[in-house]
């Protein structure tokens, strides 16, 4: 009938809150115990259903040794670990151990080890509420807003200084300077950047893909990257910097094409076939011909993001 019959209070862990039963004093002891047991059973089933991947990792079926330790760390951190926090353990995992963790829903990303299923709206909201119950308060700033923003499809949001950075992480965002970016979106960004960093100029006749630089070892920001994160300019640069990339300014050579002569009667040679290139400019002879700048180069600069020290493909 919509009446409050219980209240959650902090328990042994975030995933095991205690229940304060609020019953009418007229209830007899036996009836009260039955009602409380039923409520406890419902609460456990509700939590277990929404955070099933964490329960599976707790059980660790098929996991041994170091893999079980990684699973424990993931449960402890509610399904999200920055890769740098556990990099040594991850390096020591063999393929069998990795396969066992993947079978339980774990993804090994470039920046995070996480469980994507827990980023869905329902489990994400519940995990945030349980975390706040244990580590903050039910009315802490951002507890209602962050899960809503994540569920709305926002890939990044402006950081609110009133909201705890830990709460951003619990909901599935990573604070990157002035922006908080969803961790699954950061992994998609890594997927865009990785082939650009790996590109090498093996054949001078082959142009680099969009975003790669001719000499290799870096990349320039593309529209696909900024569209993915929903931010650009200084905010996007701050995101890259927080991930360990550094910005460099490099000179590039752009060929200057001489302007066509305007003298009357100048004959412009017709190309034999249209190959997609611009036609060569016509030059009119004179007694004192001016020097044609056709071979000159225009030097300009471009911002290039260089590879961070630890950047590599996730394994």
Where are these regions (language model features)?
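Acidic, serine/threonine- and proline-rich low-complexity intrinsically disordered segments
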Residues: 1-233, 238-239, 243-252, 259-264
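Long, low-complexity intrinsically disordered regions
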Residues: 255-315
């Amino acid at each position: 009938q919509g009446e409050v019959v219980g209240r959650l209070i902090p328990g042994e862990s975030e995933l095991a809150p205690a229940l304060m039963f609020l019953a009418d004093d007229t209830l007899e002891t036996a009836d009260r115990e039955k009602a409380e047991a039923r409520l406890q059973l419902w609460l456990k089933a509700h939590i277990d259903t929404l955070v099933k991947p964490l329960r599976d990792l707790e059980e660790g079926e098929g996991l041994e040794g170091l893999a079980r330790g990684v699973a424990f760390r993931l449960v402890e951190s509610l399904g999200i670990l920055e890769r740098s926090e556990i990099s040594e353990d991850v390096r020591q995992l063999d393929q069998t151990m990795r396969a066992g963790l993947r079978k339980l829903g774990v993804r090994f990303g470039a920046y995070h080890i996480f469980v994507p299923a827990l980023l869905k709206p329902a489990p994400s909201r519940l995990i945030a509420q349980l975390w706040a119950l244990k580590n903050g308060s039910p009315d802490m700033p951002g507890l209602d807003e962050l899960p809503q923003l994540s569920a709305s499809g926002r890939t990044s949001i402006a950081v609110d200084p009133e909201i705890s950075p830990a709460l951003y992480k619990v909901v599935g965002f990573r604070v990157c300077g002035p922006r908080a970016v969803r961790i699954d979106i950061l992994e998609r960004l890594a997927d865009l950047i990785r082939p650009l960093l790996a590109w090498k100029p093996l054949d001078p006749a082959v142009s680099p893909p969009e975003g790669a630089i001719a000499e290799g070892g870096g990349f320039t920001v593309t529209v696909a990257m900024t569209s993915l994160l929903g931010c650009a300019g200084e905010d996007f640069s701050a995101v890259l910097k927080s991930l360990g990339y550094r910005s460099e300014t490099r000179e590039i050579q752009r060929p200057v094409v001489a302007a066509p002569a305007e003298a009357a009667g100048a004959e412009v040679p017709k190309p034999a076939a249209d190959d997609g290139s611009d036609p060569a400019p016509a030059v009119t002879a004179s007694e004192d011909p001016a020097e044609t700048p056709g071979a000159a180069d225009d030097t300009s600069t471009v911002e290039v993001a260089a590879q961070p020290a630890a950047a590599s493909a996730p394994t």
